[in-house]
Amino acid sequence: MSHTPFLCYKSLLVNATWGFAKGLATGEVRSRPFLWLVTAALTGGIVMSLELAAFRLYAPYFGYSIYVWGTMISVVMAALALGYALGGWLADRSRSGTILYVVIVSSGIYQLAVLFVERSILRWLWQSGEFFGTTIASLIIFVPTMTALAVTAPFVIRLLARAEHIGITAGKVYAFSTAGSIAGILITAFYLVPRLGTRMTLQILCASTLLVGASGLVRKSAAAAVIFLPAIGVLLLPKLTYSPAVLWTTESAYNWVAVMHQDDLRWLVLNHPAYSQTTRKVGAIWSGYYSDDFALGPTLVPARRMLALGLGAGGAITSTLAVAPHLQVDAVEIDPKVAEVAAKYFGLPLGQSNLSVHIADARPWLASSSQTFDLIQVDIYQGGPYIPFYLVTREFFEEASSHMNPGGLLMMNVYDTSGSRELLAATAATLKLVFPSLFVISRSDGNHVVLAFPREISVADIRQRLSRVDGETALHAIAAQAADKVQELIPPAGTTVFTDDRAPVEEITRRMLHSSR
């Protein structure tokens, strides 16, 4: 990864902040009301940036589910409410803005301290569950600093209200604060996290907080340097080190991506270390896991063109192409870093003329495509065991069906370790509205490969086709095992059906996770 953008950003931050601090010290910037408004904007931006960075920080430990997001947002809102109340109380007891900037500096100091212990805290909490773990982590890592930053808005309103009408003052402060929040969201989402990673983002926010606090305290150039230089030093803190099992890791706009290895095994992890995407021996085609079952597709239907929604490490595509090298394959993957990893560390043949990888979100890509396919593979998860809800609804399956040739087959992996198989049943009930024939190949690890046909077919037909696999090929053992395990998938009456309007995938998955503990 090129370091040029980072150096440019750091240079911009250093020059801009130093110029502002110098201006204060030399008298070039004399408007205290303007300083207070800029402070409101910057602290608003830092709060939103911290909130976005928190989700990425938590992903490897608690996942990316809506429960993690909901819990985190609730705790942050509580911290902001506390900060607003504290800010109003302090403002009524202060004659100047000095105390405000002392509080902001204290927030930066706390952020600096947390940088050294945050990973240890998260490792300690990662098995505590989404709600409890996220709540405790947020209370320790983010609540103190966000409470301190939230002091700004009511304090600035009080400072400005001494010279202006209160209504105009409040409107002006919240306008500046909101503008800063918008800028913080955009800069963090589109630049800081994707290009620099969560760790460097948190370091930049820590330095920025210290500099904002210093800007309201300095009176001389020497004093400015005393506070300014340690703040910039935060940017030079060493990078995180990982265990020897981590072969490669990076952060993208969508995931924390890691390639793990042990002996001759290699596997891909996205966001949550407890759930791997593909595990395979180095240089091998077959994994011994559920992804091998996808290679049965060309033996079940005549296939010339295949669509793979979700790439992962490319295990399913690699094994399918080994069985049917003539297939024209379109693979859709939202994360370019995942596609890069699949080629570099797992041998996905991106250079082959019959394999096209499209970097896009699966459902919008499908809706915009005019192609039809004989075989569609669906294996998409985010934040560990959670299927994106909009990829398991009736409307999605109708869209997929409209891109399927009459003699085609849809194969989908559903991860469900619960005894009730609630998620599998709900997925089946939804599929049944579109595909008349459903079958499943279940494995003991909780992965279930669902076979959905757009026509009537019997389980005997499935077994007969599997029995035709050449006994001298590597696929023979997989086909024989599948023939023993395959069964018709019949959802119980009254089972939940997923729609775009209501798809409680996260709720069902959460129950599944709790029942498996």
Give residue ranges: language-model regions.
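SAM/dcSAM-binding transferase cores
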Residues: 456-517
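Class I SAM-dependent methyltransferase Rossmann-like catalytic core
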Residues: 278-287
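Phosphate/oxyanion-binding active-site loops and adjacent basic polyanion-contact surfaces
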Residues: 149-152, 286-290
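A motif-centric feature for acidic-aromatic and gly/ser/thr-rich catalytic loops and repeats
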Residues: 347
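Short, polar/flexible loop-turn hinges at active-site or ligand-entry regions and domain interfaces
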Residues: 350-352
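Conserved alpha-helix/loop element of class I SAM-dependent methyltransferases that forms part
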Residues: 288-302
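Short, surface-exposed charged micro-motifs
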Residues: 256-258
